[in-house]
Amino acid sequence: MKKDHLNSTDFNLWHTIREETEAAAAAEPMLASFLHQTVLRHDSLDSVLAYHLSSKLGSPIMDVRALFEIYQQALSVDTRISKCVEADLKAIYERDPACDEYSLPLLYFKGFHAVQAHRINHWLYQNGRKTLAYFLQNRMSEVFGVDIHPAARFGHGLMLDHATGF
């Protein structure tokens, strides 16, 4: 049964994700290193997202570290992206019966990953870095199987379930 965090005045999404991840690392030692690298060593949700997306979308021709820095820049310059990320995580938690923790979409749901990668691609596109946005759109399509034009605009609170055939 899901906890009703959203109606609590002291709810902190980042702290909840860290607590869930700490519990998962303790419960499943085989994933402890992955969970530490991906979530627990970071000090913010933005840093986790930038790291996780750059790890997934980096390639031999797109350095993971350079991509991480680009993602960090987008998230720090345009705080609306971070607000949308949080709204999307909350929407998935509320609407998806298979999601009983906020950390699950962040770690494992390719639909969530595709939407967040698109948000940053859109920022790049809007800020004159269209060639990079197109490159990352293509990379996102290769990795997640989701193809979204970088000029497309989304609202917040999105849930792209499974993202197969989208």
Residue ranges, per PLM feature:
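Terminal amphipathic alpha-helical/low-complexity segments used for targeting or macromolecular assembly
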Residues: 1-139
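Structural signal for interior beta-strand "rungs" in well-ordered beta-sheet cores
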Residues: 141-166
